Amino acid sequence: MTLLRVFFLFFLITGFDNKKASEETVAFTLFGRKEFVMGFISAVMFQRNSGVSCKVLVINDGTLTSFHKWCLSRIGVVTTNSQDSIKVENAIKTLPNTYKLYKEFILMKKLVDLHVLSEGCDCLIYFDSDVLFMRACHSFSDYVARCKDHQGPMIYFNKDIRHSFVTSHKEIEKEFALENIKCLNAGFFVCNQGVVKLELVEEILSNENFQMWTKNRYWVTEQTIYAILASQTNINCKLLPKNFDLQIPPNLENETIHFVGAIRKHYWRGLLC
């Protein structure tokens, strides 16, 4: 943690100029006070290494202070504000199940806030606070361009180690009449408009079996919803290539590394590569 603070102070002092960022693409990340240092560094490394020049917006989990926001402004990053919150809540106030879960489960912001606040953008990117864009990253911008150019909804996820949903992927496929749900992780993806439909999210959350499944594995609820949305017949859903995969132990030669809980202690190693 001491090393992370050293990197944090270095990036805070040197800052980052994001004034020429494209408005057509927005990169979102979600964190609060607890993950602030890591999230701050990940936002810097995205801007330095991803090959994508765009606005970076932190979805505030409600714990970021004015000091945190000032620090983020030093690297050209903005945070969601009260007006954004009102806009988001207005978008779901007629969707009772979505609204209820949004109030109870912070990771629903990865679905709802992204959909509402990316209105008018050609492409959006999402990365968790523990996703690190490495210096070896050289092809990610290609997938951003593909999403921009594709006619119709398209999304790329990084591949998870195994299917990780509120129940088995086979049960989900049967319940929602889907085929071949991808082994995806919703902590890192890039897509164009049209993937998320709030009315369909409400329909999923209204399903009695889905409600029962979430009682046992609620922490992957938003990931499961993304998997269902991305498996609709009108969505072109793909996995990013192997050098973006979530791997345990982490492969330090990958273009990005997703330092999930089991390997988060190795995050500092990625900064030294």
Enumerate the predicted regions with their spans.
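The conserved acidic donor/metal-binding loop of glycosyltransferases
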Residues: 128-132
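Membrane-proximal basic amphipathic "stem/tether" segments
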Residues: 1-23, 265-273
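Short internal beta-strands
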Residues: 55-62, 156-157
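Short aromatic/hydrophobic "clamp" motif used to bind/position activated sugar donors
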Residues: 124
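Conserved donor-nucleotide/metal-binding helix-loop-beta segment in metal-dependent transferases, i.e.
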Residues: 133-167
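Active-site-proximal specificity loops/subdomain of glycosyltransferases
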Residues: 67-120
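Catalytic core and acceptor-binding pocket of nucleotide-sugar-dependent glycosyltransferases
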Residues: 176-264
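Short, acidic, metal-binding catalytic loop of nucleotide-sugar glycosyltransferases
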Residues: 45-53
